């Protein structure tokens, strides 16, 4: 079990981005579609770093927007593997919003993304062959 825990820890992914005008909506907050795009990207990187296999998103589950993300702020996206199946895994992504010129930081969005590993024929393949 420790090997799995170590593999999960090594796969954690953290990315920072600035919220620029091209990603905001008419309320000058981060557009929901842009948020989902960033979250899926971080989840994909996390899944790939964990498995080192070809991974595809098969679902995004329960994405909760709990705090607005104003333009001119910073966001940190953190992806962690939370479940590993035979051919699929689940990644939880947390998005924190930070003020640029203060220490204020809030958890703004959370979501869960499921990925499946594919072989060269694009069929599901085991993520951890031989692992128990």
Question: Where is each model-derived feature located?
Answer:
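HotDog/MaoC-like acyl-thioester-processing domains
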Residues: 2-15, 69-71, 82-132
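Small beta-barrel nucleic-acid-binding modules, principally OB-folds
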Residues: 52-73
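Hot-dog-fold acyl-thioester-processing enzymes
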Residues: 2-59, 116-132
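Short, well-ordered turn and helix-capping elements at secondary-structure junctions
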Residues: 19-23, 60-67, 97-99
């Amino acid at each position: 079990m420790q090997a799995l825990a170590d593999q999960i820890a090594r796969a954690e992914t953290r990315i920072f981005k600035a919220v620029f005008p091209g990603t905001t909506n008419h309320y000058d907050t981060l557009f929901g579609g842009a948020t989902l795009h960033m979250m899926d990207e971080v989840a994909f990187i996390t899944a790939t770093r964990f498995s080192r296999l070809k991974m595809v998103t098969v679902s995004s589950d329960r994405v909760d927007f709990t705090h607005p993300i104003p333009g001119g702020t910073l966001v940190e996206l953190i992806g962690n593997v939370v479940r590993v199946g035979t051919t699929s895994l689940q990644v939880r992504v947390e998005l924190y919003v930070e003020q640029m010129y203060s220490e204020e930081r809030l958890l703004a969005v959370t979501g869960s993304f499921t990925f499946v590993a594919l072989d060269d024929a694009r069929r599901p393949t085991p993520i951890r062959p031989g692992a128990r």
